[in-house]
């Protein structure tokens, strides 16, 4: 193999495939990238067996074809430090990867490329086009997915007639799906998909699912990820249906107010929300720092016999995630009592957030479960779904 490629082009390709590089120490071969030179392209391929990425680079000169397998992160580190010019890459008679750029010379040891896992194959006619809405919807629900890999069925985004994600404390639902059927896409693969969608190169995306593997591709890019083999909880039963209190609030001013009041909140962003007929008072306090309070105008519909403010405790960071996932100028918050989740929605999405328990004897908000460090308390949100 012998090619000449611009340093920038090569580095961009390595950046694309780096997220699917294997980290398992028991399978060191997965820490490699496979380079394949054919005609006028250089193909880069990495996989950790669960996720794989292939990208074809075209802005280069292929002098002789071939393929090689080498340490991906070491190769990227070398390319990053080279000057912005052309890089000559070839294999020598021992199969080592030789790189030359101006006065720099590198020799990188390699492994037999035939030992690297092969790419899954799928027929072209199984793919169907997807629009930018697919990426928008994924982005709008991703925040609610559990970050705990041990809760594997929640460490994902559920794709069906709706897009759904939950971690037990909050839930995001997009009502307008793409006709997928009961797919659990791992969160780490969702993140890779969204990074691909952020690259504005004019490419048209296509997707398909085959043999429990989700594929996404463009002309020069192929992503694949193995789906989670499990069941997503029946989320419909925990959607509040009898909320009698409604607040209509300007979204951006609410975001700004939460960010300010959250500065004085505890480590779990506990905040108190007091709803009056025409105003909302946000407050927080920290035993070590002090407290904060802010009032803003809202349209609040209270219950008929209500003569006191309706007060609830919320995780400000979680509510902020919801508000930032919405697009409208105004947002509707539906509330029931001081124990039931709130519901926030717009035309296409529904977001649910558990409340924190208010401790009346203290000027602060505490969660129902003791929290140590950054570990979130278990919520009966998911327990209720899984029990039925």
Where on the chain are the PLM-derived regions?
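Structural preference for solvent-exposed beta-strand-turn elements
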Residues: 1-388
């Amino acid at each position: 193999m012998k090619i000449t490629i611009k340093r920038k082009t090569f580095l961009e390709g390595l950046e694309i495939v780096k997220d699917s590089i294997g980290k398992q120490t028991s399978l060191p071969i997965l820490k490699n990238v496979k380079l394949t030179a054919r005609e006028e392209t250089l193909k880069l391929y990495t996989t950790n067996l669960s996720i794989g990425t292939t990208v074809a680079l075209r802005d280069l000169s292929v002098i002789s074809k071939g393929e090689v397998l080498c340490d991906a992160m070491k190769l990227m580190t070398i390319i990053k430090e080279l000057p912005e010019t052309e890089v000559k890459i070839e294999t020598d008679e021992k199969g080592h990867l030789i790189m030359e750029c101006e006065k720099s010379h590198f020799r990188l040891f390699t492994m037999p490329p035939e030992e690297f896992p092969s790419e899954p194959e799928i027929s072209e006619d199984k793919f169907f086009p997807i629009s930018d809405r697919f990426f928008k919807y994924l982005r709008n629900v991703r925040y609610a997915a559990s970050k705990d890999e041990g809760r594997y069925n929640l460490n994902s985004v559920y794709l069906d007639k709706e897009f759904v994600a939950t971690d037990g404390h909050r839930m995001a639902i997009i009502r307008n799906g793409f006709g997928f059927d009961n797919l659990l896409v791992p969160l780490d693969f969702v993140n890779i998909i969204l990074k691909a969608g952020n690259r504005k190169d004019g490419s048209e995306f296509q997707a398909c699912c085959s043999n429990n593997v989700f594929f996404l591709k463009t002309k020069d890019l192929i992503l694949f990820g193995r789906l989670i083999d499990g069941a997503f909880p029946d989320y419909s039963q925990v959607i509040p249906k009898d909320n009698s209190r409604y607040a209509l609030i300007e979204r951006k001013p609410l975001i700004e107010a939460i960010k300010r009041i959250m500065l004085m909140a505890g480590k779990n962003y506990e905040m108190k929300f007091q709803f009056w007929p025409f105003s909302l008072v946000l407050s927080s306090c920290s035993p070590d720092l002090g407290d904060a309070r802010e009032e803003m105008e809202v349209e609040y519909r209270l219950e008929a016999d209500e003569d006191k403010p309706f007060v609830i405790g919320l995780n400000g960071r979680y509510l902020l995630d919801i508000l930032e996932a919405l697009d409208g100028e105004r947002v509707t918050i539906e509330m029931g009592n001081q124990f039931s989740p709130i519901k926030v929605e717009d035309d296409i999405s529904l977001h649910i957030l558990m409340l924190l328990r208010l401790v009346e004897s203290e000027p602060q908000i505490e969660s129902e479960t003791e929290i140590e460090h950054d570990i979130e308390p278990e919520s009966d949100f998911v327990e209720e779904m899984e029990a039925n």
